[in-house]
């Protein structure tokens, strides 16, 4: 199509040149050479375009075909949220330490101290363990006396009897209490932090302007991995919610700006 256009255009130019008396005629060989060059340029352009298309098709054919993501079946947890467990033993516990977290502990004895890097000021210990008074006295020595106060008062302790929880998908799951690993069974302990009371002072959180704000201390939760079962089957690691902090919730009083 483009070659035909060139031919018509050149014929048009030649007709104009023939009607003009002031311009000299182009030699016949010059006009022919110009036509040949235009035709060669058009052929080369079409050839390059075809080569580019072939290269793109060859490249697409060499790429591996992407598999469509498989939708989880009904009742089947997602891979990123659930790791099944076939058998629990000392070797298994040693190979799955990467799932351990500071707030979830697998141990054959009740922990007596808070996890590393956690504050000891709000640790209340376990009332069922002996020598609790001595430990609390020892922890009290670490408290600061710089006149600093928290907006909310919290307390932390090891929960030894957690039986159920809500996982990251909103399902009610059963927390494995005792895990048999031979001669010494282990238990799961959860280091939880919660509010002592909703209103540490008369009007809510400490240090909040009660003329403009309503305030209340609330326990906040975070997801941690734990060994659980769903519908008495599918035992494995899941993300569950546990109490981890005490925060102050604010709402502006009506009519205040």
Swiss-Prot record:
GO cellular component: axon; dendrite; extracellular space; synaptic vesicle
Disulfide bonds: 152-217, 195-246, 205-248
Chain spans, region Disordered: 61-81
Source species, domain of life: Eukaryota
Residues that carry a glycan: 131
BP GO annotations: cell surface receptor protein tyrosine kinase signaling pathway; modulation of chemical synaptic transmission; negative regulation of neuron apoptotic process; nerve development; nerve growth factor signaling pathway; neuron projection morphogenesis
GO MF terms, alphabetically ordered: growth factor activity; nerve growth factor receptor binding
Family under the similarity heading: Belongs to the NGF-beta family.
N-terminal signal peptide: 1-18
Stated name of the protein: Neurotrophin-3
Subcellular location: Secreted
Species of the source: Sus scrofa
Basic and acidic residues bias: start-end ranges: 67-79
Matches recorded under InterPro entries: Cystine-knot_cytokine, Nerve_growth_factor-like, Nerve_growth_factor-rel, Nerve_growth_factor_CS, Neurotrophin-3, NTF3_N
Keywords: Cleavage on pair of basic residues, Disulfide bond, Glycoprotein, Growth factor, Secreted, Signal
Function: Seems to promote the survival of visceral and proprioceptive sensory neurons.
């Amino acid at each position: 199509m483009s070659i035909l256009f060139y031919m018509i255009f050149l014929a048009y130019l030649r007709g104009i040149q023939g009607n003009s008396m002031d311009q000299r005629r182009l030699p016949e060989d010059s006009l022919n050479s110009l036509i040949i060059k235009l035709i060669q340029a058009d052929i080369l352009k079409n050839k390059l375009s075809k080569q580019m298309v072939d290269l793109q098709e060859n490249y697409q054919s060499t790429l591996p075909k992407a598999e469509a993501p498989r939708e989880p079946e009904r009742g089947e947890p997602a891979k990123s949220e659930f790791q099944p467990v076939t058998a629990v033993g000392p070797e298994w516990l040693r190979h799955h330490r990467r799932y351990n977290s500071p707030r979830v502990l697998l141990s054959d004895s009740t922990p007596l101290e808070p996890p590393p890097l956690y504050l000891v000021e709000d640790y209340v210990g376990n009332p069922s363990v002996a020598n609790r008074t001595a430990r609390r006295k020892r922890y009290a020595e670490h408290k600061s006396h710089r006149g600093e106060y928290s907006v909310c008062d919290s307390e932390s302790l090891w929960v030894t009897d957690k039986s159920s929880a809500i996982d990251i998908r909103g399902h009610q799951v059963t927390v494995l209490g005792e895990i048999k690993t031979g001669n010494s069974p282990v238990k799961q302990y959860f280091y939880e932090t919660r509010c002592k009371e909703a209103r540490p002072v008369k009007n809510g959180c400490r240090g909040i302007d009660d003329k403009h704000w309503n305030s209340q201390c609330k326990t906040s939760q975070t997801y941690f991995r734990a060994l659980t079962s769903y519908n008495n089957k599918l035992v494995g690691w899941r993300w569950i919610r546990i109490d981890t902090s005490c925060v102050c919730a604010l709402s502006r009083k009506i009519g205040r700006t």
